[in-house]
């Protein structure tokens, strides 16, 4: 009886589905190919890009305060602040500067380097912008980076905020264009792009991302990333939100997104927008420590911290600090990019 000597099988890694690029637009096909990579290959590529641009052990802490809550006229299917949905969120007026100052001081004492103020408006009026500009000056005087998310901006609004010291303006695209109409009908996609253009022209940095887990396909997630990566330039800050299902909203009963699909979205965002801050935003409370750790490995390097994000829950500060300690990671210094 003859014996056959067998040699160990050699491992041949798959050829990259998309070659590294320095310039040029990303197609949805190219980005979908990234999503389709074997998970270890995708994570390796994302971590490699991350290390080329950031210290992979550092995470930015940002705080988000709702300075004007509820009563919004829009119909965003995920949002508990829409007046048309019965979600238990009570409308409130714009906070006074002293209240915002106290909140910013608490955030700074807890380690935040960026302070974002959110107001539930479809589009603020001129008088609203002047009041928010006062809030920006108040927070900026503490030495914190400032960010605001106020809805659609008209001509001149971004310039007023920039003059007050605003560093970043957040205005998310939310989804790919071909899924957008399924979740929002009161504002079209071009409205969002127009606001981003006004922000850029005023010299304010852009914070722009989206929400996943709303029922979109993987290709539509690729479409969202393509829209973000092809902005000129792409956003300095990219918040990726995992849908938080709120009773009373149309998406309250949406099926959960596979956690690995969320991690893939983070990794693809990192590869396609190498120097952006990729932020874990809404939905962290439902992820657990393991998924968050994978997201950091995939290139996320910023979180919103504090026990509430606008109107929904978020891990408490101590839990975030403990998680970073367990991972041998730490908070980053203010962004000087």
Swiss-Prot record:
The GO molecular function terms of this record are:
2 iron, 2 sulfur cluster binding; 4 iron, 4 sulfur cluster binding; biotin synthase activity; iron ion binding
Annotated catalysed reactions: (4R,5S)-dethiobiotin + (sulfur carrier)-SH + 2 reduced [2Fe-2S]-[ferredoxin] + 2 S-adenosyl-L-methionine = (sulfur carrier)-H + biotin + 2 5'-deoxyadenosine + 2 L-methionine + 2 oxidized [2Fe-2S]-[ferredoxin]
Q: Which domain of life is it from?
A: Bacteria
Entry's EC annotation: 2.8.1.6
Give cofactor(s), names only. Answer: [4Fe-4S] cluster; [2Fe-2S] cluster
Q: Which UniProt keywords apply?
A: 2Fe-2S, 4Fe-4S, Biotin biosynthesis, Iron, Iron-sulfur, Metal-binding, S-adenosyl-L-methionine, Transferase
SUPFAM superfamilies reported for this sequence? Radical SAM enzymes
Q: Which residues bind [2Fe-2S] cluster?
A: 116, 147, 207, 279
How does the cofactor bind to this protein, according to its record? Binds 1 [4Fe-4S] cluster. The cluster is coordinated with 3 cysteines and an exchangeable S-adenosyl-L-methionine. Binds 1 [2Fe-2S] cluster. The cluster is coordinated with 3 cysteines and 1 arginine.
Q: Which GO terms describe its biological process?
A: biotin biosynthetic process
Q: Which family does it belong to?
A: Belongs to the radical SAM superfamily. Biotin synthase family.
Name of the protein this chain belongs to:
Biotin synthase 1
Organism whose genome encodes this protein = Polaromonas sp. (strain JS666 / ATCC BAA-500)
């Amino acid at each position: 009886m003859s014996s056959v000597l067998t040699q160990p099988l050699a491992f041949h890694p798959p050829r990259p589905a998309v070659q590294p690029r320095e310039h040029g637009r990303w197609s949805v096909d190219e980005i979908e190919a990234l999503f389709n990579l074997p998970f270890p290959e995708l994570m390796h590529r994302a971590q490699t890009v991350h290390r080329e641009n950031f210290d992979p052990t550092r995470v930015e802490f940002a705080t988000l305060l709702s300075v004007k809550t509820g009563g919004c006229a829009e119909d965003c299917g995920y949002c508990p602040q829409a007046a048309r949905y019965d979600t238990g969120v009570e409308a409130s007026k714009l906070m006074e500067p002293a209240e915002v100052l106290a909140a910013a001081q608490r955030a700074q004492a807890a380690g935040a380097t960026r302070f974002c103020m959110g107001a539930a408006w479809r589009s603020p009026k001129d008088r609203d912008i002047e009041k928010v500009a006062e809030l920006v000056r108040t927070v900026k005087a503490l030495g914190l980076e400032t960010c605001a998310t106020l809805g659609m901006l008209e001509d001149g609004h971004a310039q007023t905020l920039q003059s007050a010291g605003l560093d970043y303006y957040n205005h998310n695209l939310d989804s790919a264009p071909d899924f957008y109409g399924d979740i929002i009908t009161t504002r079209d996609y071009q409205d969002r792009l127009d606001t981003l253009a006004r922000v850029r022209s005023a010299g304010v940095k852009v914070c722009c991302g989206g929400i996943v887990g709303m029922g979109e396909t993987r290709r539509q997630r690729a479409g969202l990333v393509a829209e973000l990566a092809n902005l000129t330039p792409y956003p300095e800050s990219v918040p990726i939100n995992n849908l938080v299902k709120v009773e009373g909203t149309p998406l309250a009963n949406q099926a959960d997104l596979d956690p690995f699909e969320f991690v893939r979205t983070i990794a693809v965002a990192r590869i396609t927008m190498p120097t952006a801050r990729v932020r874990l935003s809404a939905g962290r409370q439902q992820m657990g420590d393991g998924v968050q750790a994978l997201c950091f490995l995939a290139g996320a390097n910023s979180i919103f911290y504090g026990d509430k994000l606008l109107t929904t829950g978020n891990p408490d500060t101590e839990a975030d600090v403990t998680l970073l300690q367990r991972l041998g990671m730490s908070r980053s210094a203010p962004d000087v990019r």
